[in-house]
Amino acid sequence: MELQEYELITVLGPTASGKTAFATRLANELNSEIISADSRQVYRNMTIGTGKDLDNYIIEGKFIPYHLIDICQAGEKYNVFRFQHDFHEIFTKIKKKGKLPILCGGTGLYIESVLKGYKLLDVPENLILRSNLKDKSVDELKKILKSYKNLHNQTDTDSVRKIIRAIEIETCYPTQKNNPINSYSSIKSLIIGVNIDRELRRNRISLRLKKRLEEGMIEEVKNLLETELSPDQLIYYGLEYKYITLYLIGQLSYSEMYQQLEIAIHQYAKRQMTWFRGMERRGFKIHWIDVYEMNHLNEIFNRIHF
């Protein structure tokens, strides 16, 4: 199969793997555009904590067009249903330009939903269900969620609010047949996964966390608390926003925040890899490249053997 026979190139990998830098180099080589598959980078004013690293989108002075970054206000509801719709809108526009779009990100559910063309319901909030579940622990809620068989984002269940939303979605499927449904075809995509040694990944995560704190990540969260969002809303976004918020409202010391956040990011990267390995078991062919190969595009394509 030749490269032009694909409808899409997908670049995936865990956090701190360098997948965005690789995708932008690829886009520059192919005169392409990037569609982000990151569930948090859609939000404006959440730049440092989500690792947008927009400098990556400039290669040798050339701007690489990107999409689905900074499209929502912080606090606005965004989910896989909306992502599917937004992706296909951008995907179609890029294809009409005669370009091969590149999907890049680490949110496995978002990636899988568009590649397989999952039919998804637009699920409303269930206030009664939320009230019944709000006092349960994370472990109790995870047990409830695991009792369902439908697809849900197990890489992103690190807060009570997120798990309740996942349960809300699962309970809606058998009963809300008349809700709007996204119905899209599956997409023939070349999938490239960036594989990074576990110890190197851990070192990168630790160094990156230190760098982001030095760049003003705490100030970013503080500004969001002062101007836009409540603590509960920020905690919902998890990881950096969760732990820094807990620090700012006095529930954690700086040292506790730093240690717990670092551990949580390592755990998140591990869950991402678990999701990607699950994709392989579900029939996706992922061509894994080593992080050290990323500058050698021709060698990568020759090895993949289209």
UniProtKB/Swiss-Prot annotation:
GO biological process, one term: tRNA modification
EC assignment: 2.5.1.75
Entries under Pfam families matching the protein: IPPT
Sequence positions that bind ATP: 13-20
Annotated residues for binding of substrate: 15-20
Single annotated GO MF: tRNA dimethylallyltransferase activity
Keyword ATP-binding: yes
HAMAP family the UniProt entry points to: IPP_trans (MF_00185)
Name of this protein: tRNA dimethylallyltransferase 1
Organism, scientific name: Azobacteroides pseudotrichonymphae genomovar. CFP2
